[in-house]
Amino acid sequence: GKLQLTIGETAVVAPSDAEVVVRVEASPINPSDLGLLLGMADVGNAQTVGEHHVEADVPEKILPALKARFDEAMPVGNEGAGVVVAAGGSAEAQTLLGKTVGVLGGAMYSEYRTLHTSQCLVMNEGVTPRESASCFVNPLTALGMVETMRREGFSALIHTAAASNLGQMLQKICIADGVDLVNIVRKPEQVQLLRDIGATPVSYTHL
């Protein structure tokens, strides 16, 4: 089997009353995006086919697990940010016109996205799309980790990817909420990175 990765063109849908059109200016690549973008293909042997097309082989033994993806176009990009350039007729939509917004809407590796106003988080004046592009996936994951800990009756967390963007967010949340957090990192310089934002303890593990 083959994974096909392409850049395509789609029409920009005119916004309904409660929708806006966002000109996307930044979008992160999260692990969840990579899973959808590349699946389990052998990207080390990927081949460029034409100007906007890449193909990579998918091992036969993996194909049954990917059956739902066969012959399906799957737009990528969970979150991003940009500027609202068109708005529907509702007061809420009109209020967003010209504003920088963070967006959770899927298919964010696009130039333009038409989205419901409820999918947009308005940024303060001066905050750039680049600074806004990761305001959903990692923050909600970090908050979810703390909430899950509490619901399951625990009072502390151990995090083994502590120096990541997610890990740094989790550290700040745990300090604010009074949650004990043990941070595990894989590079000595990452110890100081976390201590600079208040982490204690930090464990360095060489694998």
Residue spans for each PLM region:
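Short alpha-helix immediately C-terminal to the canonical SAM-binding loop
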Residues: 191
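NAD(P)H dinucleotide-binding glycine-rich loop of Rossmann-like/cofactor-binding domains
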Residues: 55-81, 85, 100-161
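Glycine-rich NAD(P) Rossmann-fold beta1-alpha1 loop
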Residues: 161-168
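Conserved S-adenosyl-L-methionine
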Residues: 176-180
